[in-house]
Amino acid sequence: MNRSEKAAIIEQLKARAEGASIAVVTDFKGMSVEELTRLRVKLRENGAEYHVVKNTLARIAFTDGAHDVIKDVFKENCAVALGFADPVAVAKAVTDFAKTSKIFTVRHGSLEGKFLSGEQVSDLAKLPSKPELIARALGTMNAVPTNFVSLFANIIRGLLYALKGIEEKKAAA
């Protein structure tokens, strides 16, 4: 690989990393092409990409960027998953794949510029996804007016039953 090819790889990876909300560094040593392809498909379904790049090029690409906190973890056989949509979905995809593979491990990550250990990436994967959190928040906000309307309707219904009882009592007398 000549110098211009290396520079192109660095620029491409740097540009992709700048647009990513999460970057997860993994160890892929000993994985087959079939396993890597399955991982890439799973990540693509969750709005992410998986890049196997030389460590030196990755260190240069991640210097002075949104995810520069992970530039020093590129050692031995590393690859990086870059997530552009929901960071939780990417963390889940990588963590789930690590559970099914004996070789694949999650090393570190970066979420919006904050360093994450492999354990923290696994913890992030346990959280509900962004759409689930939005649905829960909307459900909670919707519950307050619904409960208020139900309470108000019960008060009015009780008043009507009381008035109906008084009316029946007067009609019987």
From Swiss-Prot:
InterPro entries: Ribosomal_uL10, Ribosomal_uL10-like_sf, Ribosomal_uL10_bac, Ribosomal_uL10_bac_type, Ribosomal_uL10_CS_bac. GO terms for cellular component: large ribosomal subunit. CDD domains: Ribosomal_L10 (cd05797). It comes from the Bacteria. Keywords: Ribonucleoprotein, Ribosomal protein, RNA-binding, rRNA-binding. GO terms for biological process: translation. GO terms for molecular function: large ribosomal subunit rRNA binding; structural constituent of ribosome. Part of the ribosomal stalk of the 50S ribosomal subunit. The N-terminus interacts with L11 and the large rRNA to form the base of the stalk. The C-terminus forms an elongated spine to which L12 dimers bind in a sequential fashion forming a multimeric L10(L12)X complex. Belongs to the universal ribosomal protein uL10 family. Forms part of the ribosomal stalk, playing a central role in the interaction of the ribosome with GTP-bound translation factors. PANTHER family: 39S RIBOSOMAL PROTEIN L10, MITOCHONDRIAL. This is Large ribosomal subunit protein uL10. The gene is rplJ.
